[in-house]
Amino acid sequence: NMLSLINKRIFFALCIALFTGCSFPSNEPKIPQNDYNQTASTNSDFSRQTSDELLDEDDDRADKEFGSFFKKYLNTRAGGDCSGFVSIVNAKYKNMYFDEKTINNYYSKGGRKSKAIYNFYESQNLITHKNPKKGDLIFFSNTLGQGIQKNKDKKNVTHVGIVTAILPDETVKFIHNSGGKIIHSYMNLKQKNTHLKGDKEINSYVVRCSNASCLAANRFAGYGKAK
C-alpha cells in the first residue's frame, strides 16, 4: 500500500545518509571490493572499469605520487564512497594497503569498512599521528551520525583517504571520495582551526558545517603507514 511504500523510501534515504563513507563485510570479497552503498548502484563513472583493467595499467608507484592514475578519477564517483575508492587503489597496486579477506575479520559493530581498515592497521602497530608519507592512508573520526556533534571518540573512524603530498608548510594534501565524488582536500595539524589563509586552503571541511570543529585537523584520527 501507499503507506508501506513511503516508509520504505524513508528507510532507504536514512540508509544513504547513515552509511555513506562506510562498508559492510562480504562473505565473498572481490577486488576491488567497493563499499556497500546505495549511491554506488547509480555510479556510471566507474561501473565499466574492471579489476583486470586496473591491474594491467602501467603506472609506477615508486615515488608514491600515483601520477595520472589519480587524475583520471578526480570529480568522478569511483568506488562509491571513501573506502570503496581506497579499495580501487589497493587492487591497482596489488594489495599495497591490505588483503580484502583479512579486512573482513576487523569489522566493528558499526559495520563500516573505514573503521575495519583502521582496526587492521592498529592491530599491526601501523597507526601514527605524525610524519606522513605520500601513499599513506589518512583516517578521520566522527564525520557521520551522532559523533558529528560530540566529536569525542577519536577512534570512531568514519572516513578514509590517501595522502598525495606534504607541502612545505606541513599541510597534508589527500585524495578521497567525499559526498560521492573524488576530490583533493587539505589538513594542517599546526593550524587546526584555520580553513583559509588568503586564497590558500589550510584545512578542508570534512563535515558539512561551518564550525572550526568540522575542519580536517579536528576530525583527524591517524595515518595508516603504507607498504
Task: Indicate where each model-derived feature is located.
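Bacterial N-terminal signal peptides that target proteins for export
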Residues: 2-11
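Aromatic- and glycine-rich peptidoglycan recognition patches
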Residues: 23-38, 48-54, 148-227
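N-terminal capping segments
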Residues: 24-108, 143, 218-227
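Hydrophobic, Leu/Ile/Phe/Ala-enriched alpha-helical segments that form helix-helix packing faces
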Residues: 18, 89-90, 161
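Bacterial N-terminal signal peptides
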Residues: 12-21
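...with weaker cross-activation on analogous glycine-rich loops/strands in unrelated enzymes
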Residues: 101-184
